[in-house]
Amino acid sequence: MASVTSEKCVILSDGTEYDVTNYLVANKDAADLLRRYHRQEVADILNATSKSKHSEAVVEILKSAKVPLKNKEFSDLVDQNIGVGYGNEFIVKPTDLDKDFEKNHFLDLKKPLLPQILFGNIKKDVYLDQVHRPRHYRGSGSAPLFGNFLEPLTKTPWYMIPLIWVPCVTYGFLYACTGIPFSVAITFFIIGLFTWTLVEYTMHRFLFHLDEYTPDHPIFLTMHFAFHGCHHFLPADKYRLVMPPALFLIFATPWYHFIQLVLPHYIGVAGFSGAILGYVFYDLTHYFLHHRRMPNAYLTDLKTWHLDHHYKDYKSAYGITSWFWDRVFGTEGPLFNEQGKISTKAK
């Protein structure tokens, strides 16, 4: 097992990474101080008018690092100081709201966003270019969408998804078992679970990313932003990441009626229940890919894969819970090299 002092230690300052591992190994007395700032942005501390003993020590340590690490390519957005690191190590940097609006003249993040799109006379080409250039709202709050009593309806904490839908899945499966044998019910439940992965891919690629096929009209651009554009514009907003239950109900109802048309009632209920569980996995996976460190290599690659979709190429990597259907339909994205293997350069 590696000693505490031999483990890699990186400190961030103004979007630049400093590898101070060698200093830590040579100066074991500084280990506690350095570990305190590992993978943290310290620019505000270092630039403070009244520096503490600790901040002065960190300044000297960064100077001793001599050459900062070059950030791994993370699209041209890294150059815009939007974040540092990659994959599990990616850390967002808050957007300077005033400078962003002054530079791009797109949306003022301090004002309600939907009215700006609806009444702002924004052309589609400008909208599509800007909405796929992520911004990060300061603090733990959310940028306003409506700016009125409707605002709370646009926010959904992640835990509401299992809290609402897992009981529905359980009830649906048990209900199906009253009309068909358990073995049949569980078979179609599993089929529904895996069918969701195709629905997930199809919905993300052909519905949420209509993009160029969206009519060049403020109403349609506003709808695009409300459905998915907002998430690409503000990907780190933890309250506008999972799908609001009311919106999911609107999406799910036509699918339920379609399944009831093509399958016997109880079989349809079993399959639909499995698909709903697939959706729960999808939404939770999506949330944690954005907001948690992944515990193993596969999930770390999956996180990298999804961040590529946001920060490198939004026209690829549509799968969230897996890349299976992207491999089938040739939309793998930057994580895979030309031989179809995970590219070490992408990491």
Curated annotation (Swiss-Prot):
Cofactor remark: Binds 2 Zn(2+) ions per subunit that likely form a catalytic dimetal center.
Cofactor(s) it depends on: Zn(2+)
Topology feature Cytoplasmic, residues: 1-156, 200-238, 282-347
Keyword Amino-acid biosynthesis (UniProt): no
Compartments in which it is found: Endoplasmic reticulum membrane
Gene Ontology cellular component annotations, sorted alphabetically: endoplasmic reticulum; endoplasmic reticulum membrane
Positions bound to Zn(2+) 2: H231, H286, H290, H306, H310
Keyword Transcription assigned: no
Binding site for Zn(2+) 1: H204, H209, H228, H232, H309
Keywords: Electron transport, Endoplasmic reticulum, Fatty acid biosynthesis, Fatty acid metabolism, Heme, Iron, Lipid biosynthesis, Lipid metabolism, Membrane, Metal-binding, Oxidoreductase, Transmembrane, Transmembrane helix, Transport, Zinc
TM helices/strands, residue ranges: 157-177, 179-199, 239-259, 261-281
Highest taxon of source: Eukaryota
Pfam families for the chain: FA_hydroxylase (PF04116)
Recorded metabolic or biological pathway in which this protein acts: Sphingolipid metabolism
EC id: 1.14.18.-
BP GO terms, sorted: fatty acid biosynthetic process; fatty acid metabolic process; mannosyl-inositol phosphorylceramide biosynthetic process; mannosyl-inositol phosphorylceramide metabolic process
Segments on the Lumenal face: 178, 260
Broadest EC class assigned to this enzyme: oxidoreductase
Family in the record: Belongs to the sterol desaturase family. SCS7 subfamily.
General function of this protein: Ceramide hydroxylase involved in the hydroxylation of sphingolipid-associated very long chain fatty acids.
Protein known as: Ceramide very long chain fatty acid hydroxylase scs7
Species: Schizosaccharomyces pombe (strain 972 / ATCC 24843)
